[in-house]
Amino acid sequence: MTQGRDPKHIKRLRDLVDGVLLLDKPVGLSSNDALIRAKRVLNAKKAGHTGTLDPFATGLLPLCFGEATKFSQDLLEADKTYEATVHLGIKTNTGDTEGEAIETAPAGVVDAVTDAQIEAALARFRGPIMQVPPMYSALKRDGKAYYEYAREGITLEREARPVTIHGLEFISYEAPMLKIRVTCSKGTYVRVLGEDIGAALGCGAHLNALRRTQVGPLTIDGMITMEALQAHAEPLTLLAPVDALLASFPSIELTAELAVRFLQGQRLALGKEAVAVPAEPGRVRVYSDGKLLGTAQLQEYAILAPERLIAKAA
């Protein structure tokens, strides 16, 4: 038996796959299917994504492999940026192009919408808002997804939830297509935002296209298509390091002695043995000799409390 076919050797190779793939998800592919395909190409043992994109949406889908999966929750909680095309004048039952038209504005209404009206409408949705989640969503009630109820013709009462629209930029309007850029908090449905903008303009709307361009500190720079991934001779070279997920947190460098204690899960009182301790308490990246050890909470009086640890230095 050759080493290349030795199951133990293959397992060792799979265990070595650590990092983040910045995938440009295509239209029509679910986030889970994208993850399965990428995991197969990379021959990875452990994989996870950082929050789903609807099948009709495209753009940045960060996929985590190996040790990076320990930190995927950080991007689930992170702010996200999208470029969206809102089709004014037609409302669908799903809020996007996959649904059926249920309302159509009278002729001429959409053509009469002005840039000033759009700017005024967008201003209403900047900052903290309350948003009612859509029926066509993966939220659950009594163990059953909302979209399953919707497909049965059942509409549930849904409570509005607080979300924050950090940025809402008017890009262009060529009737009936309105292009916007949205930066929003976790839990925001851009489909619903598009519908609400249409309602504010008095003409109804649905989302015609959606492209995600940023998730937390990760941007479209270095993003790769599924086709390019599958065709690449050395796909593992496409992975960003694990700490790419944590770039928004300040860092601490530990001596070798402190690093051993940190990896044992010990709380550390930092003194001269740590370099460049952040001034404010909070979450930090922890390194030793330039290698990521994990994350921790920097507490008052320079106490470092381990949080998530890397099994092998990254």
Model regions: which residues?
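Accessory RNA 3′-end/elbow-binding domains used by RNA modification enzymes
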Residues: 1-26, 32-49, 53, 57, ...
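Short, charged/polar surface micro-motifs in flexible loops or helix N-caps
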Residues: 28, 66-70, 90-91
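The conserved catalytic core of RNA pseudouridine synthases
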Residues: 40-44, 62-65, 155-187, 191-202
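Glycine-rich loop at the start of a catalytic domain that most often binds anionic cofactors/ligands
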Residues: 60-70, 75-79
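Structural signature of FAD isoalloxazine-binding scaffolds in flavoprotein oxidoreductases
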Residues: 73-88, 156-170
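Acidic, low-complexity central loop/insert segments
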Residues: 74-130
